[in-house]
Amino acid sequence: MKIISPVLSNLVFSRSIKVLLCLLWIGYSQGTTHVLRFGGIFEYVESGPMGAEELAFRFAVNTINRNRTLLPNTTLTYDTQKINLYDSFEASKKACDQLSLGVAAIFGPSHSSSANAVQSICNALGVPHIQTRWKHQVSDNKDSFYVSLYPDFSSLSRAILDLVQFFKWKTVTVVYDDSTGLIRLQELIKAPSRYNLRLKIRQLPADTKDAKPLLKEMKRGKEFHVIFDCSHEMAAGILKQALAMGMMTEYYHYIFTTLDLFALDVEPYRYSGVNMTGFRILNTENTQVSSIIEKWSMERLQAPPKPDSGLLDGFMTTDAALMYDAVHVVSVAVQQFPQMTVSSLQCNRHKPWRFGTRFMSLIKEAHWEGLTGRITFNKTNGLRTDFDLDVISLKEEGLEKIGTWDPSSGLNMTESQKGKPANITDSLSNRSLIVTTILEEPYVLFKKSDKPLYGNDRFEGYCIDLLRELSTILGFTYEIRLVEDGKYGAQDDVNGQWNGMVRELIDHKADLAVAPLAITYVREKVIDFSKPFMTLGISILYRKPNGTNPGVFSFLNPLSPDIWMYILLAYLGVSCVLFVIARFSPYEWYNPHPCNPDSDVVENNFTLLNSFWFGVGALMQQGSELMPKALSTRIVGGIWWFFTLIIISSYTANLAAFLTVERMESPIDSADDLAKQTKIEYGAVEDGATMTFFKKSKISTYDKMWAFMSSRRQSVLVKSNEEGIQRVLTSDYAFLMESTTIEFVTQRNCNLTQIGGLIDSKGYGVGTPMGSPYRDKITIAILQLQEEGKLHMMKEKWWRGNGCPEEESKEASALGVQNIGGIFIVLAAGLVLSVFVAVGEFLYKSKKNAQLEKRSFCSAMVEELRMSLKCQRRLKHKPQAPVIVKTEEVINMHTFNDRRLPGKETMA
């Protein structure tokens, strides 16, 4: 029997005990949960309730512990510490206290000074530091134990810039709360150098919440596009003050950089018409997110806001949602690192946590779909890189989503794709508008009534009917106010200030200007206009001239001076041509003594004086004893008779009108006539569109007219159309005004008339302040009225008067070349034909004489030409050789006494 050594026995027993204890520890470990502590440092206000971030921190830890899906074998605990605002020393002390307890990560604090102090400690000891608010990164630190769930400031700045570009703003005012706002909005601040954008930067008062002085200055400067970079609590106060100052109207558009715009109580502003736009990172369209937010609201973990704070009760703020997501993201990293344990760390020893680097890497690699959407981090600097923003805007139903923005795709506006039918009355329905106008017949005038009238019932006219139709279509109500200074609106050359209705629109004292307000270039630069509801132009109003009886020489009027001159020239020309052709044609020569066939003398009746007498006789329809014998001269005579027939008939027909009509002679017929004289004064309404036209015109005639008017400004420029019309009636004055008003006036006053045509072309439109959302609605309604024919019917209603008796033509039109020029062409053609016939007769007779006289054709032609060129009525014929004349030829000569004697054709 072998004996076992006591020493060996003790060794075996000891090892067995250790194995048993190890197995028991493993079994215990598998049957129990691992406990992990998170640290939270939060700022607080003395005597104030617990902050939303701390509540969300506790809510997230409790939710994870209740729902074992994420960390089934780990129980989270937390240690929370409170510090005063901006107390970095206290923040460092609290962080060291938590690290000595042993924490896996520290959440918070929020403000930069405290957060930087805590971050430096976490970096030194290798403990992750989780941030949920924006903090400026001084420099990239690859080894930084820091992540932030707040969207990157450069991305948010680009999102705001995209909104500004989408709204096509040209001027923007940036209002920031503290200096960090300029860093957050640096992309927008750099925009003027790259885009056509004017930027004005203002800062909210630091020591008070009273923003009224700043808002008053912005209102005076007409700054309608404003970006507010402030907290949602400050935004709520600003909106209340803006409402009290009348800055919550449709002309203002505010963009808020806070992601908590949805937490504001916007009920007082829903129907104000103000444009309010912002961003939201909470993914409220996700059912799981909505369920968590609903639990948050039901448990009412967050302390209710103060009664007049302007914030909604029970809403989960963005800071709270980001803290909730931050706890879950860190928990995802814990899930992937089950062997991690925490240890007590001392700030004065600078010994880092051995699991810190690995744990920090897991946090930066973590992905989570949280309340604020996808959560991923830049592994280098720990900033959140991938996120989606909802673009929200204030509507009558409240804040609604109108688009999205993300860093990769940019802005995507989806407001028009909501399936709602387009309705032009949406933005005007049930709104009450201030309408400025001016008394101007027939556009706006006081209604005549035996009973006292009040409000809008005091007025009637074309513009009042137009306003009533627009109100019916668009569904708005209105209050009519007469412009205070009684002017349409013009710009002062010295200080550049506007007056009249234009000024009231610029100052937003009125929403619409419904009046005969002309659309001009200079006005269009400061206010907006609808499409014109009436087109017109500038013309001249002048009194009708007195009638005059026909003058002593009015018998010359039926034909224009040009025609009289052409007739005289035609008479002289035809007479000369007849004389030449008669001399040239052999058949116009005859024997004055037919009984003496041997006579060598021949005669030609068409001497120069006789030719003129022949033309006068035909022209006076009396005839003469002279009768052409040759074909060529008869052609001249016939054409001249035809010419005189047409001329005399036309003259006779037109003479009656000139002798019976009283001519209405006006000293001016056009603007050129006005510009060329100074006897008749002329002017327009002071500070009206007509005056501005002449003032700005570069055309020499109109520039000359403006020089005349400006030199006599006090005497020729009038205050109103009524004053100008009265001056036309009582003095030698021409009034420049719109053609439609002239048409109305001349229908009712038969002593007035329009002189000339239109000097320019323009239109009347409904004026609105610059950028008004009403302009397009008004334009659509005006086009609808135009298509329905209502604009024409309204004009017929107000322009139709008793009418003046129809006037006969002021004067019969003198016949000009365009009326009877053809007869001159016929006359010229006849003269040309007669010349050719005369040449033919000359050649034929020369050839015949050459044969009879037995000589050459050329010598015979020269002899005939020599005789024709002698301006004598009777010539003696000198034959070159004797010729025996037979009896038959003598008899033949006596028979035709208009032919030359045989053998005598050639004259000496």
Curated annotation (Swiss-Prot):
One of its GO terms (molecular function) is ligand-gated monoatomic ion channel activity involved in regulation of presynaptic membrane potential. It is a multi-pass membrane protein. CDD domains: PBP1_iGluR_Kainate. Keywords: Cell membrane, Disulfide bond, Glycoprotein, Ion channel, Ion transport, Isopeptide bond, Ligand-gated ion channel, Membrane, Phosphoprotein, Postsynaptic cell membrane, Receptor, Signal, Synapse, Transmembrane, Transmembrane helix, Transport, Ubl conjugation. The modification Phosphoserine is found at residues 846, 868. Residues 1-31 form the signal peptide. The chain crosses the membrane at residues 562-582, 639-659, 820-840. GO terms for cellular component: dendrite cytoplasm; glutamatergic synapse; hippocampal mossy fiber to CA3 synapse; ionotropic glutamate receptor complex; kainate selective glutamate receptor complex; membrane; mossy fiber rosette; neuronal cell body. The keyword Ribosomal protein does not apply. Changing residue 571 to C: In RNA edited version. Changing residue 620 to R: Abolishes ionotropic glutamate receptor activity, no effect on cold receptor activity. Disulfide bonds join 96-347, 750-804. There is a cross-link at residue 886 (Glycyl lysine isopeptide (Lys-Gly) (interchain with G-Cter in SUMO1)). It comes from the Eukaryota. Glycans are attached at residues 67, 73, 275, 378, 412, 423, 430, 546, 751. Ionotropic glutamate receptor that functions as a cation-permeable ligand-gated ion channel, gated by L-glutamate and the glutamatergic agonist kainic acid. L-glutamate acts as an excitatory neurotransmitter at many synapses in the central nervous system. Binding of the excitatory neurotransmitter L-glutamate induces a conformation change, leading to the opening of the cation channel, and thereby converts the chemical signal to an electrical impulse. The receptor then desensitizes rapidly and enters a transient inactive state, characterized by the presence of bound agonist. Independent of its ionotropic glutamate receptor activity, acts as a thermoreceptor conferring sensitivity to cold temperatures. Functions in dorsal root ganglion neurons. Belongs to the glutamate-gated ion channel (TC 1.A.10.1) family. GRIK2 subfamily. Homotetramer and heterotetramer with GRIK5. Tetramers may be formed by the dimerization of dimers. Assembles into a kainate-gated homomeric channel that does not bind AMPA. Can form functional heteromeric receptors with GRIK3. Forms a heteromeric complex with GRIK4 and GRIK5. Interacts with DLG4. Interacts (via C-terminus) with KLHL17 (via kelch repeats); the interaction targets GRIK2 for degradation via ubiquitin-proteasome pathway. Interacts with NETO2. This is Glutamate receptor ionotropic, kainate 2. It comes from Mus musculus.
